[in-house]
């Protein structure tokens, strides 16, 4: 029972379901979610499995840091052994690759690149100032392009991917501020460790402003109408408030920023629904 619970925790089902939803939104914005349900389903499933595998292998490599930052996670508390977590991640990655192989060539290439990124993130990039954050930001933004590419229209998710990447970079920096003590003890050179938490939070705020500036582009270029603009405003406001909140409470700030990201993504669905 405890092992099963630990495996579920390693996958982080809320995060993986959210990633799958973002892939679906990419396919939907591209106009192919209804017309190509099999491809959309395969892309969503591949995203879910790959994200779950990435979370599991991240916890495998992060197990010593988690003994300080988060001792209640599955590996530090003994619910799942390190070897078990590694094997679990391999099974999830194989499943993701099998589903991705059924998709168009560009989608397969994106999936292969993302799987490579997930495998190298914790071991090689997490401790490098900004590099790990940039990779996670790319992975977050690419879910939309992957969904769009799965139905044959990769460019349709471009602006949404840019908005997601900018805001995800900001959120990852805030999370590093939250984990500052454990990362410093583990010898990781994250951005807050190198430049200090105040400067790191200022960097995250700049990226949030960049995401806010990108949000009206679909309206300005005529892709979506004014209903999209109305729908995206709450998400932008929440993200800006989150950036400010992170200065006093990084944990609350990054959670609020995630909600703002989801609201902004939902605005693209609204834009597609009301666009002739």
Curated annotation (Swiss-Prot):
Transmembrane segments: 14-34, 90-110, 144-164, 200-220, 221-241
GO biological process: glycerophospholipid biosynthetic process
Subcellular location field: Cell membrane
Membrane association type: Multi-pass membrane protein
Record GO cellular component, one term: plasma membrane
Enzyme Commission (EC) number: 2.5.1.42
Record carries keyword Cell membrane: yes
Cofactor: Mg(2+)
Keyword terms: Cell membrane, Lipid biosynthesis, Lipid metabolism, Magnesium, Membrane, Phospholipid biosynthesis, Phospholipid metabolism, Transferase, Transmembrane, Transmembrane helix
Pathway note: Membrane lipid metabolism; glycerophospholipid metabolism
Recorded catalytic activity of this chain's protein: sn-3-O-(geranylgeranyl)glycerol 1-phosphate + (2E,6E,10E)-geranylgeranyl diphosphate = 2,3-bis-O-(geranylgeranyl)-sn-glycerol 1-phosphate + diphosphate
GO MF annotation terms: geranylgeranylglycerol-phosphate geranylgeranyltransferase activity; magnesium ion binding
Uppermost EC category: transferase
Pfam short name (any one): UbiA
Similarity-based family: Belongs to the UbiA prenyltransferase family. DGGGP synthase subfamily.
Function, in words: Prenyltransferase that catalyzes the transfer of the geranylgeranyl moiety of geranylgeranyl diphosphate (GGPP) to the C2 hydroxyl of (S)-3-O-geranylgeranylglyceryl phosphate (GGGP). This reaction is the second ether-bond-formation step in the biosynthesis of archaeal membrane lipids.
PANTHER family documented for this protein: CHLOROPHYLL SYNTHASE, CHLOROPHYLL SYNTHASE, CHLOROPLASTIC
Protein name: Digeranylgeranylglyceryl phosphate synthase
């Amino acid at each position: 029972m405890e092992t099963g619970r630990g495996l579920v925790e390693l996958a982080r089902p809320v995060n993986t379901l959210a990633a799958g939803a973002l892939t679906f939104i990419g396919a939907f914005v591209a106009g192919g979610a209804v017309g190509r349900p099999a491809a959309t389903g395969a892309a969503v499933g591949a995203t879910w499995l790959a994200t779950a595998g990435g979370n599991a292998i991240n916890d495998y490599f992060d197990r010593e840091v988690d003994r300080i930052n988060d001792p209640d996670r599955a590996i530090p508390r003994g619910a799942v052994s390190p070897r078990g977590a590694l094997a679990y991640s391999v099974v999830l990655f194989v499943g993701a690759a099998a589903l991705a192989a059924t998709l168009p060539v560009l989608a397969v290439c994106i999936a292969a690149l993302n799987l490579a990124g997930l495998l190298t993130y914790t071991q090689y990039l997490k401790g490098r100032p900004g590099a790990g954050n940039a990779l996670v930001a790319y992975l977050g933004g690419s879910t939309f392009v992957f969904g769009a590419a799965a139905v044959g229209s990769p460019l349709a998710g471009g602006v949404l991917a840019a908005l997601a990447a900018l805001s995800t970079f900001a959120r990852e920096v805030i999370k590093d501020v939250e984990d500052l003590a454990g990362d410093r003890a583990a010898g990781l050179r994250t951005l807050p460790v190198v430049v200090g938490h105040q400067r790191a939070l200022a960097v995250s705020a700049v990226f949030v402003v960049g995401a806010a500036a990108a949000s009206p582009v679909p309206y300005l270029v005529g892709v979506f109408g004014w209903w999209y603009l109305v729908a995206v405003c709450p998400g932008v406001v929440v993200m800006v408030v989150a950036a400010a909140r992170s200065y006093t409470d990084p944990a609350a700030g990054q959670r609020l920023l995630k909600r703002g990201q989801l609201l902004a993504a939902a605005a693209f669905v609204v834009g597609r629904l009301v666009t002739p």
